[in-house]
Design a protein with these regions (language model features):
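Polybasic, low-complexity intrinsically disordered segments
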Residues: 2-5, 10-54
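Patatin-like phospholipase
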Residues: 52, 56-104, 112-354
Length: 354
């Protein structure tokens, strides 16, 4: 049942909402002090889900500056997006409106949050939300719902009065074009979802879930009879510049989740992987092909930079992995990303002409 913390005689950040499982026996003042300190964790308060705001009280950030002729391209990377979500928050704070956004995997979540003009959801999705006990764990993986429980993370929490309510009305009102990429398990081919595919919020969220479905860690997602996994297995290895190119763009602001000198290594035991994926052989081949595709895309980005056709944000460091669940580390990654965004802002302005 929902309990408004502001009804209690304990000072906490506002607005804030706590959900307790029915029958939970907790010392409520101690709980509120823990919330105030920011140390509510899965282990300390397992039945708790923090909802940092009510959607009805949230106002979308205005877009005041149009970016002409440049597409925004958002790489995936799971929880590494804690670092790069700061880039989106910074752009929203500046009111920058790109005409086109392409996102894959975690980048698809950033795409939706950016178009809905929601900096708070952008930040929380890859930081504090990881403390939610229903986010996923070994138990949910063994139960067949995935190490990250995709249905809960992407579809359930976006609903009103849930952990991360999504402003679908603002999203629909936007004129920005976008593409979200996923990979078909049948042939390993790339599928691009656009605004025309998303008549309802669940249409959007299930496609973000499909784009973010890590093979082996999350079960495939079926949409209209077609089964999908992570879009990072597609043609460019997870950097969806091809989505923007399909819509005619030749100038890009690319946000990567790996440092500039990163090179993706080949799969060590391809035959073992083929055996593990014997029921979906195209997925195995896409995983095996991904390092070469990814490295080729990074080389293409370097060429585009040299030609003045791309600005690429590379993290100076990457302190978290794609499966990180420690909120303190995720917050630190976000802070590092924001510090880098602030430092690079003058270069952004020069490239974008704003």
């Amino acid at each position: 049942f929902p309990l408004r913390v502001d009804d209690l005689d304990v000072p906490v950040p506002q607005p804030f909402q706590v959900f307790l499982d029915e029958g939970t026996d907790l010392n409520l003042p101690d709980l509120c002090r823990a919330v105030t300190r920011g140390d509510v964790t899965r282990s300390s308060h397992a039945p708790i889900i923090a909802c940092p705001r009510q959607l009805t009280t949230w106002q979308a950030r205005p877009m005041t500056t149009s970016i002409d002729g440049t597409a925004l391209v958002l790489e995936g990377g799971g929880m590494r997006a804690a670092y790069t979500s700061a880039v989106i928050v910074k752009m929203l704070g500046l009111g920058w409106k790109f005409p086109h956004v392409s996102g894959i995997s975690a980048g698809s979540s950033l795409t939706a949050n950016y178009i809905s003009r929601d900096p708070e959801r952008t930040r929380l999705s890859f930081t504090d939300f990881a403390a939610d006990p229903r986010f996923g764990n070994l138990g949910t993986w063994l139960a067949g719902r995935g190490y990250f429980d995709g249905e809960y993370i992407y579809q359930r929490t976006a609903e009103p009065h849930q952990a991360l309510p999504f402003d679908f009305l603002t999203f629909c009102a936007s004129s920005q074009a976008f593409r979200i990429g996923a990979t078909r398990t049948s042939d390993g081919g790339q599928e691009w979802f656009t605004r025309e595919d998303m008549k309802t919020m669940d249409d959007l969220m299930v496609r973000i879930r499909a784009s973010s479905t890590m093979p082996g860690f999350m079960p495939p997602v079926t949409i209209e009879g077609v089964e999908y996994v992570d879009g990072a297995l597609g043609d460019t290895g997870g950097i969806p510049i091809d989505g923007a190119q399909l819509d005619g763009y030749d100038r890009f602001f690319v946000v990567c989740t790996r440092p500039r000198d990163y090179i993706k290594n080949e799969v060590k035991r391809p035959q073992t992987l083929r055996r593990l994926c014997r029921h979906r052989p195209a997925v195995a081949e896409a995983i095996i092909a991904r390092p070469a595709r990814y490295n080729a895309t990074r080389e293409m980005l370097r060429d585009l930079e040299s030609d003045g056709k791309a600005y690429v944000f590379y993290p100076r460091v990457m302190p978290v992995t794609n499966k990180e669940r420690n909120v303190t580390k995720l917050r630190q990654a976000y802070a590092l990303g924001m510090a880098q965004a602030n430092a690079e802002l003058p270069q952004w302005r020069v490239f974008l002409g704003v």
